Structures are given as C-alpha cells and as structure tokens.
C-alpha cells in the first residue's frame, strides 16, 4: 500500500511535463500563425509597392506625352520657319524688281524737289522783301505818331508842371524822349542796308543749291553700287535657306515616323502592364490559397501521426536527404563554375558599349532559364526540411545560405539582376543603403548558422551587387524573441526532469488505410509545394519583355537625341550665315544712319535757330511795345499822382479851415480843476503826436514813391537800350541763317525718304532674326526636357531594380522562416513521441539533454 504513493508522484510530474510540452507545442503553433500573418502583411506591402510602380509608369507616360506635345510644337515652329523662308524669297524677288523703279522714282523726285525748292526760295525772298518794306513803313508811321504824341504829352506836362517845382525833371524827360527818337532813326537806317546785304546772300544761296545738286548725284551713284553688291549676298542667302529648308523637311519626316513608332510602343507597353497587373493578382491569390491548404494538411498530419509512422517518415526522409545532398553537391560544382566564368566576364561586361544592350538582355533570358531548376527543390523544403548533418563545415553552410539567397520564384532570377548590375554597376551600390526596417520582423527569424562569423556575413554579397549593411547583418544573426523563448522553455524542460518516468496510459493510433491516405496527402502537398506557379512564370516572361522594350526605347531616345544634335548644328550654321548677313546690313544701315543723323541734326539745329531768331525778333518787338506802353502808363500815373497830391493839399487846407471853424463854433468849456485840465492837456498832446507821426509817415511814403518812379524810369531807359542792341544782333543772325535753312530743307526731305526705306528693311531683317532665335530657344528647351526625362526614367528603373532585390530578400527570408518552423514543430513532435515511448527516466533525461538548443540550426534531423 505504501508503494503507489511514490510511484504516483513521478507519474503526475511526467503528466505535468507532457502538458507543458503540449503547451509549448501550442505556443509554437501560435507563433507560426503569427509569422503567417506577418508574411501576409509583407504581401500587402509588396502589393503597395506594385501599385507605386504602376503610378511611376503613369508618370512616365505623362512625360512621354509631354515630349510628344513638344515635338508637335517643334513641328509647328518648323512650318513657321518654312513660311518665313518663303516670305524672304518673295521679298528678295520683289526687291530686285522694284530696285530700278525706286531709283528712277528717286531721281524724278529729286529733280522735282530741286525745281520746287528754287521756286520756293525765290517766292520766299520776294515775300520777305515785300513784308520787310511794309514793316518799315508801318514802323515809320508808328514812330512818327509816337513822336507827335510824345511832343504833345511833353507840352502838356510842361503846361501842368509850370506851377510846381519839378521843371528840371520834365526837361530831363524831354531830353530823353528826343534821344529815344534819334536812336529809333538810327535803327531804321541800317535795316535798309541789311536788305541789300540779304539780296547778296540770296545769290550765294543759289550757288550753294547748285553744288548740293551735284553732290546728290554722286551719292545716288554710290548708293546704286552698294545695292548691286548687296544683291549677290542676298542670292547666296536665299540659296542657303533653300538647302536648309530641304534638310529640315527631311528631319521633320523622320521625327514624324519615330513619333508614330514611339506611340505604338507606348500603347503596347500599357496593354502589357495591364495584363501583368491581372496576372500578379491571380498569382498572389493562388499563393495564399496554397499556403492555407499547406497549413491545414500539416495540422491534420500532426494529429494522426504515431511513433511507428514517424519512424517510417524518418526512413523516407533519409532517402530524400541523400538525394538532396547529391543534388546539392552537383549544384555547388555548377555554381563554382558559374562564379569562375562570371569573374572572367566582369571586365568584359563592364567595357560593353550602349549598342550591346540587346545582347545583354538575351543573356539575361538564358540565365533565367538556367537558374529556374533550383527553385523546385527549395520550394519542396517547405514541407520536408533539409537533412544536412550537424557536421557539415562552415564553408558548406555559407554556400548553402548563399544558394538559398540566390533562389527565387516570383520576381525574376538573380542572373538577370546580375546582368543588370554588370550593365549598370555605377547605380547598383545604392541598394546597400537599405536599413533593417525595409525587411520587417521576419529577418530576425532567418536560420543562418551561428558558425557564420562577422567576416563571412560581411563578405556575403548578392549576385546582383546587393550588399547587406551592418544593421541587417546583426538583425539576421541575432535571435528573435520567439527563438529566445523557445530556448528558455527547452532548457527549463531539461533541468526539471528529475523524477521517475512512467509511460502514459495510452496514446492515439491510426489504421493502415488512414496511414496510406496520410502518405498520399503528404506526397500531394509536396508536389504542390514543389510545383512552379504558372502565373509567376508568365510574370517573369512579361518582365523580360518589358526590359527588352525598355532597351529599345533607350535606343530610340539616343537616335532622337542624335537627330536633335544634327538639327541644332544645322540651326547654328544657319544662324551664323544669318548673323553675317545681319552684320553687313547693320554696318551699311549704321553708316547711312550716321549720315542721316548728321544731316538731321544740322537741319534741326538750323530750324531751331531760325525759330529762336523769329521768336526773339517777335519777342523783342513785343517787349519794346510793352515797354513803351509801360512808360506811357507810368507817365500817366505820375501825372495822376501830381493831380492827386494837389487835390490832397487843397482838401487838407480846406479841412483845416473847416475844423477851425467847427471848433470855434463849439462851446469849449475849460475844466475847473487842475487834474481835469492836466488830463485834457495830455490828451491833446497825444493827439498832436499822432498827427505828427502820421504826417511824417505820409511824407516818407511820398518821397519813396517819387524815388521809385525815378528809378523805374531810368531802368526802363536802360532796358530799352539793351533791347535795341539785342534786336540788332538777332536781325543780323537771322539774315545769316535764312540762306542755310532753305538749302537744308531739301536735303532733309531726301534723307527722311531714305531713312524710311532703310528702317523698313531693318524691321524685316530684325523680325526674321527674332523668329530664328525663337526656334533655337525652343529646340534647346526640347533638348533639356528630353535629357531630364531620360534621367528620370533611368532613376525610376534603378529604383525598381532595388525594390525587386529587396522584395526578393524578404521572400527568401520568409521561406526560410517557414521551413525552420516546420522543422521545429516536427522535432518537438518527435521528441514528445520519444518521451512517450521511453522506458525509464534515464532515457527521458538523455532525450531531454539532446534537446538543449540555442539556435534553430542545432535541431537534429528527424
């Protein structure tokens, strides 16, 4: 009765241990489901990347559409240039036809102008003489009238001022008036002499006109010779424009054909992109469905397997492992040979020119076909883990990890990426800037062996030139939290097994038919995992086709750039020829403009001088008349002031007598007191002071007015003398300039006509130059846009390559994580079965001691 107690204790402890192991298994299953969810999240991220790539393609299409619009703009500019060339040709023919007519017309106009100028000069001289005589007669009569009126006024003043004390001032004024009359007589006499001098100058002006006619004939002959020399240059320019027109037409035809081809290629690429989108969606759905079915099959197998069936599975696995080991050895040899060949080919591929891009694409397709064979064996490992022993060397494990990184089944093989990296080795290094966040949490679950030291990880390089960063190496090498938890549970299991072991009361068994059905399901699941997806292969083919089209598009862009350079060279030649012609025309126009400007300046100066003289003469006359009127007014004001003073004196005398009589008539009462008398005296004294100050002020004011009037009269006399002198000088200058002005008028008219013709030709040439400059600027802008579009396309291409490499590494990591979890679950099931079948506690301890693991790669092969 005492024995059941101790025996039941180990039984309970073993049952607890088994329950703990079952809990651990359930936790592993939950971790596996969590990793599946994370893998689905990665799939969603990949889908987002795919949509981003689709948006990039749309942007590229927009860039291509903009280039097409620019090409249409260039075509319109070409048509405008052709129209301008035709206009230039028509202008040249019209100028040749109308040149002689213009010369004849100029000669005829010149003769008519000379005759009209001679007639005008004669008429103006006659009119000027007649007007001058009339003016002299009028001035004589005016001065006679003025003299008579002055004499009358002087007599009147003498009569008025005979009573006063200012007789001396009146005599002085009379003397001054007589002097003024004498000065006016002296002015009239020289003007008669000047009329005779003007007649002499008129004859001299006629002689000058004849000399100018001879000089005009010489200038016209020189102009005709210059026109003949310009005609040859114009013919050469027209010939050059014809050749340029033919070349530009050919270029336009070529550009039109190439644009049609580019549009066709763009439409094909759009269709292929849509097809690729649908195929990728289908492939994604199929992959998820296969993963779901695989997990369901694995769960069913875990439920029904027994220890005997597990042993049979182990035997089958050993056979499969031997076959896999043989295949791996063969593949390693093949990879070594391929690496040696690639090392030999690297300098050759780096020296390839851009014309060999199509050959590189064909090599990519061959390498794709050669590397697809390694996909099936690695995909089959999802269900049956690889059976490499623990004793394989570090080098073998490194090569195995490298081979696993090279395998792919969805985004293209590593060979295509390698060829791309060799062709574009200057861009592939940007992939090394990826950080750990780009790979997600699945990177930490990769089953890289601890035997991979830092040097081996640092030397690990993807075939496409993809380098892992230090952070990524640490993330791959480090243990995930799930792995740490698993290791801790296993260590706790081994340390806690100290009690005796009693085999469980019973375990689950299956029949032979069920076992055969399970074997068939396992075989079918392995075939499903090993079978390659048709959607993925179609996707790879479409991706290769897109790459070929991309290379063709680059070739077309290069051809278009070459044609654009040729067009720019031709445009530069045309601009040089045009610049030379413009320089010649500009030089001739500058010479003629200098001559015209000099003559115009002379004519303007003469006209301005004539106008100034006429204005000065008229102003002098007006000033003299105004001064005479002012003198008359001042004299009248003085006489009025004398009359007013006389009246004031009379009125003051009358007012004084009136006030005296009024004061006498008033009853004046003397004050009685001394104070009142004193106040009255003070008041009268103040009144007397005020009256005296007022009288002094009036006296000073009258004296000041008299002095001011005297000074004003003297100033007016001086101003009158100065005006007479200036008028005399201006009359002489006017006589000198009249002859020169009449001769310059005809010359000015002729120069204006020539200036108008030259300005019209200059405007036409400047318009042509502006149109050609606009064409050049538009072509330069088109070239800049094409180069920018090319750079953006290349940048997008390399970004897509980097994305593909990153997604490939994520896919490889997720596949390895799934394999490791399957391996771990199978190992735990085997260990549980072995514990159930163990006969003693020593056997259980030995089994648990074998399960002290720190890494997933240390699990024994089942």
From Swiss-Prot:
CC annotations in GO: cytosol; early endosome; early endosome membrane; endocytic vesicle; endosome; glutamatergic synapse; intracellular membrane-bounded organelle; protein-containing complex
Start and end residues of each stretch annotated as Disordered: 315-338
InterPro entries cross-referenced by the UniProt entry: Rabaptin, Rabaptin_coiled-coil, Rabaptin_Rab5-bd_dom
Residue stretches in coiled coil: 11-345, 534-816
Effect of mutating residue 820 to K: Strongly decreases RAB5A binding affinity
Record-stated family: Belongs to the rabaptin family.
Subunit relationships: Homodimer when bound to RAB5A. Heterodimer with RABGEF1. The heterodimer binds RAB4A and RAB5A that have been activated by GTP-binding. Interacts with TSC2. Interacts with GGA1 (via GAE domain), GGA2 (via GAE domain) and GGA3 (via GAE domain). Interacts with AP1G1 (via GAE domain). Interacts with AP1G2 (via GAE domain). Interacts with ECPAS. Interacts with KCNH1. Interacts with PKD1 (via C-terminal domain) and GGA1; the interactions recruit PKD1:PKD2 complex to GGA1 and ARL3 at trans-Golgi network.
Protein name: Rab GTPase-binding effector protein 1
């Amino acid at each position: 009765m005492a024995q059941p107690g101790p025996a039941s204790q180990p039984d309970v402890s073993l049952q607890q241990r088994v329950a703990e192991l079952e809990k651990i298994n359930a936790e592993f299953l939950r971790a596996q489901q969590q990793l599946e969810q994370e893998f689905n999240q990665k799939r969603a991220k990949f889908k987002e990347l795919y949509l981003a790539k689709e948006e990039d393609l749309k942007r590229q299409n927009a860039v291509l559409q903009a280039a097409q619009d620019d090409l249409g703009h260039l075509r319109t500019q070409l048509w405008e240039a052709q129209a301008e060339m035709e206009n230039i040709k028509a202008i040249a023919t019209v100028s040749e036809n109308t040149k002689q007519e213009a010369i004849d017309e100029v000669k005829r106009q010149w003769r008519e102008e000379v005759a009209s100028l001679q007639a005008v000069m004669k008429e103006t001289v006659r009119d000027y003489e007649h007007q001058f005589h009339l003016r002299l007669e009028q001035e004589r009569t005016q001065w006679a009238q003025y003299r008579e009126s002055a004499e009358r006024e002087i007599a009147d003043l003498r009569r008025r001022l005979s009573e006063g004390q200012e007789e001396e001032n009146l005599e002085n004024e009379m003397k001054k008036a007589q002097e003024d009359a004498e000065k006016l007589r002296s002015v009239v006499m020289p003007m008669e002499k000047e009329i005779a001098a003007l007649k002499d100058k008129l004859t001299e002006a006629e002689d000058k006109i004849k000399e100018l006619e001879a000089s005009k004939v010489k200038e016209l002959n020189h102009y005709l010779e210059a026109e003949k020399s310009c005609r040859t240059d114009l013919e050469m320019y027209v010939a050059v424009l014809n050749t340029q027109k033919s070349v530009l037409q050919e270029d336009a035809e070529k550009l039109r054909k190439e644009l049609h081809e580019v549009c066709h290629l763009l439409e094909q690429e759009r269709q292929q992109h849509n097809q690729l989108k649908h195929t990728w969606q289908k492939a994604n759905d199929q992959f998820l469905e296969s993963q779901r079915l695989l997990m369901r099959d694995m769960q069913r197998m875990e439920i029904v397997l027994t220890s005997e069936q597990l042993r049979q599975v182990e035997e089958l696995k050993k056979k499969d492992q031997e076959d896999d080991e043989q295949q791996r050895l063969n593949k390693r040899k093949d990879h070594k040979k391929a690496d040696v060949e690639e090392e030999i080919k690297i300098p050759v591929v780096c020296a390839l020119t851009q014309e060999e891009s199509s050959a590189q694409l064909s090599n990519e397709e061959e390498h794709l076909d050669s590397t697809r064979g390694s996909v099936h064996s690695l995909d089959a490992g999802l269900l049956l883990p690889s059976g490499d022993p623990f004793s394989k060397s570090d080098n073998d494990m490194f090569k195995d990890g490298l081979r696993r990184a090279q395998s792919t089944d969805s985004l293209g093989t590593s060979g295509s990426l390698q060829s791309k990296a060799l062709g574009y080795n200057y861009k592939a290094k940007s992939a090394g800037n990826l950080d750990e966040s780009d790979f997600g949490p699945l990177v930490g679950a990769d089953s890289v062996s601890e035997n991979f030291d830092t040097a081996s990880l640092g030397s690990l390089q993807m075939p496409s030139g993809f380098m892992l960063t230090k952070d990524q190496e640490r993330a791959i090498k480090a243990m995930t939290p799930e792995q740490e938890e698993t290791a801790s549970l296993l260590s706790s299991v081994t340390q806690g097994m100290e009690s005796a072991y009693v085999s469980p009361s019973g375990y689950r068994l299956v029949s032979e038919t069920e076992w055969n059905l399970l074997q068939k399901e396992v075989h079918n699941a392995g075939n499903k995992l090993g079978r390659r997806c048709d959607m993925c292969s179609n996707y790879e083919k479409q991706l290769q086709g897109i790459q070929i089209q991309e290379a063709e598009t680059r070739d077309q862009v290069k051809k278009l750039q070459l044609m654009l350079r040729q067009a720019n060279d031709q445009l530069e030649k045309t601009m040089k020829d045009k610049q030379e012609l413009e320089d010649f025309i500009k030089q001739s126009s500058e010479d003629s403009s200098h001559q015209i400007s000099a003559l115009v300046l002379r004519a303007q100066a003469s006209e301005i001088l004539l106008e100034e003289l006429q204005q000065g003469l008229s102003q002098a006359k007006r000033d003299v008349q105004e001064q005479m009127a002012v003198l008359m007014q001042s004299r009248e004001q003085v006489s009025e002031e004398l009359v007013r003073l006389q009246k004031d004196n009379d009125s003051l005398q009358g007012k004084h007598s009136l006030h005296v009589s009024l004061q006498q008539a008033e009853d004046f009462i003397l004050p009685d007191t001394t104070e009142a008398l004193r106040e009255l005296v003070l008041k009268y004294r103040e009144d007397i002071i005020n009256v005296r100050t007022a009288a002094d002020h009036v006296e000073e004011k009258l004296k000041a007015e008299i002095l001011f009037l005297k000074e004003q009269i003297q100033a007016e006399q001086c101003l009158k003398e100065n005006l007479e002198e200036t008028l005399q000088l201006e009359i002489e200058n006017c006589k000198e300039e009249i002859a020169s002005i009449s001769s310059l008028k005809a010359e000015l008219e002729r120069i204006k006509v020539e200036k108008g013709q030259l300005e019209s030709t200059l405007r036409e040439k400047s318009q042509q130059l502006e149109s050609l400059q606009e064409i050049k600027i538009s072509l330069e802008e088109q070239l800049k846009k094409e180069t920018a579009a090319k750079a953006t396309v290349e940048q997008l291409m390399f970004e897509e390559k980097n994305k593909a490499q990153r997604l490939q590494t994520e896919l490889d990591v997720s596949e390895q994580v799934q394999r490791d979890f399957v391996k771990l679950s199978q190992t735990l099931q085997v260990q549980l079965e072995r514990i159930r079948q163990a006969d003693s506690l020593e056997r259980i301890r030995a089994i648990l001691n074998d399960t002290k693991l720190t890494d997933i790669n240390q699990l024994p092969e089942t």
